[in-house]
């Protein structure tokens, strides 16, 4: 029941991001040079990581959001390990304006998924015989802005 100043109504209309379910869609870990690669290394390996965010609308307020993390340690014939993780969640977004919907889906939802994806990779790398790889936090807002800039740059330009 609402009190006299409308507090309950305000709470009912507050924006909300509900994580309905989270899941691994696809995962692979390769240790192509084991057991040779498991010994002491002369220097720290080169680690490369790529991040992709994808989303699709499932219903009016429901979205599936995926983080795809691909990475490797070492180079060429000296590859220590490779991984690819497609980690997803289904989110229900409530009371979010249409103008804010896309940024929320592409920034806030991946931000909620990331710690779980990071732990899956750390555990797999450790299980592969290496020290765990803890991926640095990702600035999904910067990633989103970069993607918008890339789309704008690739759009055909109208000539006047």
Curated annotation (Swiss-Prot):
The keyword Protein biosynthesis does not apply. InterPro entries: SecB, SecB-like_sf. GO terms for molecular function: unfolded protein binding. The keyword NAD does not apply. It comes from the Bacteria. One of its GO terms (biological process) is protein transport. It is found in: Cytoplasm. Belongs to the SecB family. This is Protein-export protein SecB. It comes from Beijerinckia indica subsp. indica (strain ATCC 9039 / DSM 1715 / NCIMB 8712).
């Amino acid at each position: 029941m609402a009190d006299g100043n409308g507090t309950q109504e305000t709470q009912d209309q507050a924006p909300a991001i509900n994580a309905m379910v989270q899941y691994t869609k696809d995962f692979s870990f390769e240790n192509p040079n084991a057991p040779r690669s498991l010994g002491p290394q002369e220097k720290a390996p080169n680690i490369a990581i790529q991040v992709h965010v994808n989303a699709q609308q499932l219903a009016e307020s429901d979205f599936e959001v995926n983080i795809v993390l691909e990475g490797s340690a070492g180079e060429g014939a000296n590859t220590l390990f490779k991984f690819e993780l497609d980690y997803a969640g289904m989110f229900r977004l409530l009371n979010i304006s249409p103008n804010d919907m896309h940024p929320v889906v592409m920034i806030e939802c991946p931000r909620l998924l990331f710690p779980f994806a990071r732990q899956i990779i750390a555990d797999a790398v450790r299980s592969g015989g290496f020290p765990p790889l803890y991926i640095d936090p990702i600035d999904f807002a910067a990633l989103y802005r970069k993607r918008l800039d890339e789309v704008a740059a690739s759009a055909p330009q109208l000539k006047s």
